[in-house]
Amino acid sequence: MQQKPSRPVKATLRTRQPLDSEESDLQPDSNAADSSTSSSAQLLALLSRLFAPLRRSPNFSATLQHVKGLLYDQQYLAAFGTESEEGERWREVYAARWVPSRAVIYQRIFDECDIAQHLGWQTPSGETNGGGGGERPRSEEEELEQERERAKLRRRLRQEGKSADEISQAVAELEQQFRAARSSKADSKGEGAAAVVDAIMIGAGAGSEVVALGAVLGVAAAGRASSGDADPTLAAAEYRPPPRVRVHAVDQGSWDVLLDKMAQGLRDAWPTLDSEHVEEDGGDQQQPRFDVRFVKGNILDNKMITTAAGSSSPVIDFGSSSLRLITICFTITELLLQSRLETLRLLSTISRSAPSGTLFLIVESASLAQIPIGQEGRTYPLGRLLDHALCGGGDKGGGGGGGVWEILKSEDAKWYRMPNDADEVYNAMGKGTKVKLENSRVVLRLYRKR
């Protein structure tokens, strides 16, 4: 299951102007947009260093055409699963061509969804705590409930004759209780040492979402350091380093070698992602703070997500207490076309198993967002199908989800455009085949487990 293709680096990038068919209100012109384009430049520079030797190869274009032919003929296992030196080259050429634009898009989406904050690598605005397990985002329902609690408290204190200063102090203490409650739901186990959180990325073999997540965390950690959030003089009770993040990239192809290269490139670019001393099995060991683990297999195979005889946990454990994030990027339509029944069963398993507070991000190309239903040529919008499977229908419907998910973000046709200088940044490392980075219009859903 794979996402299929539909000079010195500059410090900042400008975003391409929209085409006539694109939505003009998506033009980033704020400080946040400047920050986003700068971090995109860092990510593209990393990928440029990684793939430049490959693009300079005289056989790059011919190999790329061969890979395109395999994809056109839907020979995905041949393109991505051939166990040979030639097969490894096919995978690298595919990644060099399509990963950069996908990674930039996913990086922006992760930023928009506050994934770094959710994983404990970025503190909420205005706070200087060291982080730890992080604070989960609030839904509109929670915000309304908390505002009702504040209003109720103010009303009661006024009736008791309290002064304005006393009321303000009481409301501030209530706000601290709200933050503590949110953080406790996101924190994983462990005291003193950094916690461990897990992210399961389905269909992530080529690594677009993996490098995007690594870049988002690396930039967030650098921001914490520059703002003083990581001040070692803070009391131990106040400061905790960001948790180790274990990424489980699940795919049918043989992507382990390429993912190892990408993970090492991320750790070289952002040393905060590199190893740390942790106590495991009674000894002190070095473990990457950003740990990428490849899991080969078909996620629709029931053996992947159920506990085998003699095993304490399944290959992919959606019920792990340390699970914080699940992603399915540019893969969900392929799964549904492969088997709608098995895909809905997978969503049901995730819904039953995932711990409360887990974020579930699904992204798909808007051009693939009409799912065929039945034999009459009818189609059904992907976003509506996902919402019904995960959020609607109660215990009797919704693909078994029982309404256990709430929608935090919903887009049915949002454009993500490459910065103007993206091609120049990515193609900057010497001569070779020039790669054109492409805009994408996507369907996006961000859910949170209740």
Regions found by a protein language model. Give the residues of each.
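C-terminal His-loop and adjacent cap/lid subdomain of alpha/beta-hydrolase
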Residues: 207, 212, 379
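Class I SAM-dependent methyltransferase Rossmann-like catalytic core
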Residues: 77-130, 134-196, 208, 215
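Class I SAM-dependent methyltransferase core
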Residues: 199-201
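Conserved S-adenosyl-L-methionine
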Residues: 203-205, 251
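Phospho-regulated, Ser/Thr/Pro-rich intrinsically disordered or coiled-coil terminal scaffolds
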Residues: 65-77
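Histidine-anchored nucleotide/phosphate-binding helix
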Residues: 212-221
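Alpha-helical recognition domains of nuclear gene-regulatory proteins
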Residues: 70, 97, 109-112, 216, ...
